[in-house]
Amino acid sequence: ALPISKNLILQKIREEERKVVYDQYFEKEKDIVTGIVQRYVGKNISVNLGKADAMLTENEQVKGEVFKPTDRIKLYIVEVKNTPKGPKILVSRTHPELVKRLFEAEVAEVKDGTVEIKSIAREAGSRTKMAVWSNDENVDPVGACVGMNGARVNAVVEELRGEKIDIINWSDNPALLIENALSPAKVI
């Protein structure tokens, strides 16, 4: 009876530990985390997030991005699932929300809500177009996101490994929004 109760206690402890880890990462769902690349598993990448590992699947990787073990990378947590083996954390480097969260971390005006990211169109690894709007007429939304000498946007570009980012002014008028998106080309 003693070995059975010992195993039962150990099993309950492991279950509680898995629940704590699940809860911790469930709170970070739809947010960014920094992970350390562990190894390649086929075409997928195993990433250590601290208390748990995540798998960056091939379809959530940016084409052409190559990581080596010990590289620190920022990831967007798409979903956290509870499984009998512990939490399964689905992460992405291609999700448009990754760009939004990186700007929230880099630009105080975006974080505090003065500047709002209204829309993001992303071709991961190549180009992102982001439409921004300010609820304070004294704050230039594009300028706030670009930063002095491009410092803020360059920090995000660096994290995205050179992906081009176009920041445009948002407009409720679809024709004006399209004109802004196509700039510097002229819409006739």
Residue ranges and their predicted role:
Residues A1-I188:
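RNA-contacting regions in translation and RNA-metabolism proteins
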